[in-house]
Amino acid sequence: MIGSEIHNFAKELWPINRSITGEGVRETIELIKRHLPNLTVNSVPTGTKVFDWTVPKEWSVKGAYILTPSGEKICDFTENNLHLLGYSIPFDGKINLEELKQHLYT
């Protein structure tokens, strides 16, 4: 029974876009707290220095995809959040395939 519960929990967590900061992390923590109600969570504001690191700004994505020359939408972030590298910078424009390949990771 516990194996199926863990699997169902993982399926619930999978579609949430998580980074090291942001709404996805907060949503994930709330789901975890359903199973660990005594979990203590501390928040640290953006810009806080932590040893040799600074807490970054939240990274929020509304949508991301690639359109083929025929207009077909591929690599759609709404279908799989792994289609976008975390902390990617916004881009809106047309580039050729060779230039696109310089920005793809497989």
Q: What spans do the regions from the language model cover?
A:
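N-terminal hydrophobic/helix-forming segments and targeting peptides
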Residues: 1-106
